[in-house]
Amino acid sequence: MDAEAAKMIGAGLAAIGMIGSGIGVGNIWANLIATVGRNPAAKSTVELYGWIGFAVTEAIALFALVVALILLFAA
């Protein structure tokens, strides 16, 4: 296998981390909407935790993107 093909395969595998992050963000917001629907008084508290969870989950996707780009262009 030549080096260019290995770089492409590695970048593709690193990008798989973004799929999991997308699923996680969807689950966070779906559960937040369901929780506020059941208990509207808890909206401010639940919304804060939702944004924190979103930020942490999205950071994982950004790390996966950075690794994929490093594998493509710097390795």
Swiss-Prot record:
Belongs to the ATPase C chain family. It is a multi-pass membrane protein. It comes from Rhodospirillum rubrum (strain ATCC 11170 / ATH 1.1.1 / DSM 467 / LMG 4362 / NCIMB 8255 / S1). GO terms for molecular function: lipid binding; proton-transporting ATP synthase activity, rotational mechanism. Keywords: ATP synthesis, Cell inner membrane, Cell membrane, CF(0), Hydrogen ion transport, Ion transport, Lipid-binding, Membrane, Transmembrane, Transmembrane helix, Transport. CDD domains: ATP-synt_Fo_c_ATP5G3. GO terms for cellular component: plasma membrane; proton-transporting ATP synthase complex; proton-transporting two-sector ATPase complex, proton-transporting domain. F-type ATPases have 2 components, F(1) - the catalytic core - and F(0) - the membrane proton channel. F(1) has five subunits: alpha(3), beta(3), gamma(1), delta(1), epsilon(1). F(0) has four main subunits: a(1), b(1), b'(1) and c(10-14). The alpha and beta chains form an alternating ring which encloses part of the gamma chain. F(1) is attached to F(0) by a central stalk formed by the gamma and epsilon chains, while a peripheral stalk is formed by the delta, b and b' chains. The record marks 58 as: Reversibly protonated during proton transport. The chain crosses the membrane at residues 9-29, 52-72. This is ATP synthase subunit c. It is found in: Cell inner membrane.
